[in-house]
């Protein structure tokens, strides 16, 4: 009811605030026998954690995850997996000036109205700091998906402000601080971000995520369509204002003869649908994109109001990302993994013994 959990068979529940003692999560429904340890999660946590480059927040958190339960002798037991990450680099005094003010564009005002109070330190529960636990849980899902089903999930920054990737080279993604797939644009990105930081402003971004080797048949009609659940999960990431599956909003300008993905026994001719037909996976790569707004935590003064309803001018202090899309890449991967993991378990529960006379496209 309180909106802190996602999933039906693979359930992830997170807790914690930006400046609290720790962040944590509980994973329910992970099958037993999966070899897992902290190192499996730490790789993605290190990709997401703050303070790793000059393009992200200066807050330095090691984000060392600890497994509290659900794993014995290196394997999942089938019981609840408890995870925790301690907060070690809070500077709550940076937020004392906004204790009685609302930052425009943030959740300060809406949290105050909903709950009658709020944790003003770094945004409290509304902070993207919470996503560290999603990444940890997503790493568990990613390992199961790859080890048991051969499913791989990769994300990348496809656009930062006006700069778009024209080449998709996954080999480049993990070798630059932007998670950007087009090496020819890296110098341009660097210059753009340096000028942006000088101005004290921020910028939006587009993040893309792709899952390959997904089997046919995942997704439930009508309200638990696979694309609906993916959109729900991705939309739940902080700062996301739009989600596209496949060609997304570009379909507005497409004709039916162009958009339909023609099929033959050898394979599909295209993938405008993004790997999902009728809410069910088609066996093609699942492709999703998210649009992320520019953070409102900037040093440019802005008009707002106080808790008492008086006019105020707000200048956000503290340490913030000038572009939240950069560190969102592993978060988007994690959310897609959690949804696919959940739907795999749901599909197995109901349809494990289903046999179709129709061959899988591309497998003949």
UniProtKB/Swiss-Prot annotation:
The UniProt record lists the keyword NADP: yes
Gene3D superfamilies cross-referenced by the UniProt entry: Chorismate synthase AroC (3.60.150.10)
Binding site for NADP(+): 48, 54
Single GO cellular component term: cytosol
Primary enzyme class: lyase
GO MF term set: chorismate synthase activity; FMN binding
Cofactor(s) needed: FMNH2
InterPro entries: Chorismate_synth, Chorismate_synth_AroC_sf, Chorismate_synthase_CS
One Pfam short name: Chorismate_synt
Cofactor binding note: Reduced FMN (FMNH(2)).
PROSITE patterns with a match to the protein in the record: CHORISMATE_SYNTHASE_1, CHORISMATE_SYNTHASE_2, CHORISMATE_SYNTHASE_3
Pathway: Metabolic intermediate biosynthesis; chorismate biosynthesis; chorismate from D-erythrose 4-phosphate and phosphoenolpyruvate: step 7/7
Catalytic activity: 5-O-(1-carboxyvinyl)-3-phosphoshikimate = chorismate + phosphate
Keywords: Amino-acid biosynthesis, Aromatic amino acid biosynthesis, FAD, Flavoprotein, FMN, Lyase, NADP
Any single GO BP term: chorismate biosynthetic process
Positions annotated to bind FMN: 125-127, 238-239, 278, 293-297, 319
Domain of life according to the entry: Bacteria
Family named by the database record: Belongs to the chorismate synthase family.
Alphabetical list of NCBIfam families matching this protein: aroC (TIGR00033), PRK05382.1 (NF003793)
Subunit structure: Homotetramer.
Function noted in UniProt: This reaction introduces a second double bond into the aromatic ring system.
Name assigned to this protein: Chorismate synthase
Organism of provenance: Shewanella loihica (strain ATCC BAA-1088 / PV-4)
């Amino acid at each position: 009811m309180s909106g802190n959990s996602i999933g039906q068979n693979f359930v992830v529940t997170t807790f914690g605030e930006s400046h609290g003692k720790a962040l944590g999560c509980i994973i329910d429904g992970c099958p037993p026998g999966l070899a897992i340890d902290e190192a499996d999660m730490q790789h993605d946590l290190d990709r997401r954690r703050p303070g790793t480059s000059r393009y992200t927040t200066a807050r330095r958190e090691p984000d060392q995850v600890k497994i509290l339960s659900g794993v014995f002798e290196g394997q999942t037991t089938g019981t609840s997996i408890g995870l925790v990450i301690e907060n070690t680099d809070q500077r709550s005094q940076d937020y004392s000036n906004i204790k009685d003010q609302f930052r425009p564009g943030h959740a300060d005002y809406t949290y105050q109205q909903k709950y009658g109070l709020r944790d003003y330190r770094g945004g409290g529960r509304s902070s993207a700091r919470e996503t560290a636990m999603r990444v940890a849980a997503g790493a568990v899902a990613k390992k199961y998906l790859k080890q048991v089903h051969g499913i791989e999930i990769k994300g990348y920054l496809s656009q930062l402000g006006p700069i778009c990737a024209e080449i998709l080279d996954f080999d480049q993604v993990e070798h630059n601080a932007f998670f950007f797939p087009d090496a020819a644009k890296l110098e341009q990105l660097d210059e753009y971000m340096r000028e942006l930081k000088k101005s004290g402003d921020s910028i939006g971004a587009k993040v893309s995520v792709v899952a390959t080797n997904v089997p046919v048949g995942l997704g439930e009609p009508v309200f638990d369509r696979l694309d609906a659940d993916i959109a729900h999960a991705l939309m739940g990431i902080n700062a996301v204002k739009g989600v596209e599956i496949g060609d997304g909003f570009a379909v507005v300008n497409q004709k039916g003869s162009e958009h339909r993905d023609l099929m033959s026994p050898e394979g599909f001719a295209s993938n405008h649908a993004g790997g999902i037909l009728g809410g069910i996976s088609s066996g093609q790569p699942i492709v999703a994109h998210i649009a992320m707004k520019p953070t409102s935590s900037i040093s440019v003064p802005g008009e707002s109001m106080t808790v008492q309803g008086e006019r105020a001018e707000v200048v956000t202090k503290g340490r913030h990302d000038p572009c939240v899309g950069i560190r969102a890449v592993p978060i988007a991967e994690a959310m897609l993994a959690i949804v696919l993991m959940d739907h795999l378990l749901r599909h197995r529960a109901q349809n494990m013994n289903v046999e179709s006379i129709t061959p899988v496209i591309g497998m003949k």
